[in-house]
Amino acid sequence: MPANAPITQDVHTIPRKLPDGPVNLVGLTRAAMRDALIAEGTPEKQAKMRVGQIWQWIYQWGVRDFDLMTNLSKAYRAQLKEKFVVEVPEVVTRQVSEDGTRKYLVRIAGGHEVEVVYIPDEGRGTLCVSSQVGCTLTCSFCHTGTQKLVRNLTAAEIIGQVMVARDDLGEWPEIGAPKDETRLLSNIVLMGMGEPLYNFENVRDAMKIAMDPEGIQLSRRRITLSTSGVVPEIARTAVEIGCQLAVSFHATTDDVRDTLVPINKRWNIEVLLEALRAYPKVSNSERITFEYVMLHGVNDSDEDARRLVKLIDGIPAKINLIPFNEWPGAPYKRSSNNRIRAFADIIYKAGYASPIRTPRGEDIMAACGQLKSATERARKSRKQIAAETGLAGA
């Protein structure tokens, strides 16, 4: 299929509209916020200034109560309270792994739930953000792929995940305090539930807010979007977001990738690589990260490693090797440590960085490929769970 093939409506799930009521200012672009303020009575000449003030309160200071926005007049604050709200997703549960990883189950409009993961590391902290409720891609090794797509998240629900994580980490700076460059949440990866490029506009708007210099202030180099290979949107990502790009590659032949990542049947390896070769030039990114989950006897041979090196020749790249994180009923097994190291060594000797990802948060089902909303898991009957885990009749 050509790279410019249109994305059909069957992969777009329109976010459910909230009931009539106050407008949530979270997730609006600056232009949309300006229009919303004008529509509710803010004089047009003042609107740009008001957007700047409110924007700073929400995204720089983490303030959600209009009464605390003290550089606005009391009358204007009362007007805002009548017409608008500043709302973020509700944290339903918070789990902390033995390794310090935190997993949040957050509830969004309609009662739906998604998972968000914070991964602390030396000198950095990464938040893994979801973009959809469920997923449409049905990647055979991924737990999220077993949960049907319900809908896209709104920009408010995406940036709201960042905001609730900052709440939990105590990351909002004290108003008036000297600027502190030390951050617990320093990076965002769009690697949670869903395919970000099947929700492009909302992901773009949320990440623009994250990168805004008067708000959360994350550099585009600290934001990584991971795609399974929605080729028509890759060039658009380079132009309209400009963040780092990771691709869920996972196989070196179309036959294997068709099974592991079924979107490959639509945009195969050759077409995907063509789009990836152009990305660093357009986005000014240093390199592309190729994510490669290590599956015993499926994609982990020396031949696979050598073929991978040939496929990506000429692309500035890092190959991130991911030991498979098993989940109940998973049809695959993790490659042995020796096999993973041998695979990595072939890639390294060819001149590519080939770090082996250390699994994080496995004890709370927060590792790569394990995310699935708790309510979805809870819907399974005891019989289904027993069958999946091999405990039937025990």
Curated annotation (Swiss-Prot):
Record carries keyword rRNA processing: yes
Active-site residues from the entry: 115 (proton acceptor), 368 (s-methylcysteine intermediate)
Alphabetical list of SUPFAM superfamilies matching this protein: Radical SAM enzymes
Enzyme Commission number: 2.1.1.192
Residues engaged in binding S-adenosyl-L-methionine: 194-195, 226, 248-250, 325
Gene3D superfamilies membership: 1.10.150.530, Aldolase class I
Gene Ontology, cellular component aspect: cytoplasm
Cross-referenced Pfam families: Radical_SAM, RlmN_N
All residue ranges annotated as the Radical SAM core domain in the record: 121-363
Reaction it catalyzes: adenosine(2503) in 23S rRNA + 2 reduced [2Fe-2S]-[ferredoxin] + 2 S-adenosyl-L-methionine = 2-methyladenosine(2503) in 23S rRNA + 5'-deoxyadenosine + L-methionine + 2 oxidized [2Fe-2S]-[ferredoxin] + S-adenosyl-L-homocysteine; adenosine(37) in tRNA + 2 reduced [2Fe-2S]-[ferredoxin] + 2 S-adenosyl-L-methionine = 2-methyladenosine(37) in tRNA + 5'-deoxyadenosine + L-methionine + 2 oxidized [2Fe-2S]-[ferredoxin] + S-adenosyl-L-homocysteine
Binding site for [4Fe-4S] cluster: 135, 139, 142
Bridged cysteine pairs (disulfide): 128-368
Family: Belongs to the radical SAM superfamily. RlmN family.
Note: Reaction proceeds by a ping-pong mechanism involving intermediate methylation of a conserved cysteine residue.
Primary role: Specifically methylates position 2 of adenine 2503 in 23S rRNA and position 2 of adenine 37 in tRNAs. m2A2503 modification seems to play a crucial role in the proofreading step occurring at the peptidyl transferase center and thus would serve to optimize ribosomal fidelity.
Stated name of the protein: Dual-specificity RNA methyltransferase RlmN
Upper taxonomic lineage: Bacteria, Pseudomonadati, Pseudomonadota, Alphaproteobacteria, Rhodobacterales
Primary gene name: rlmN
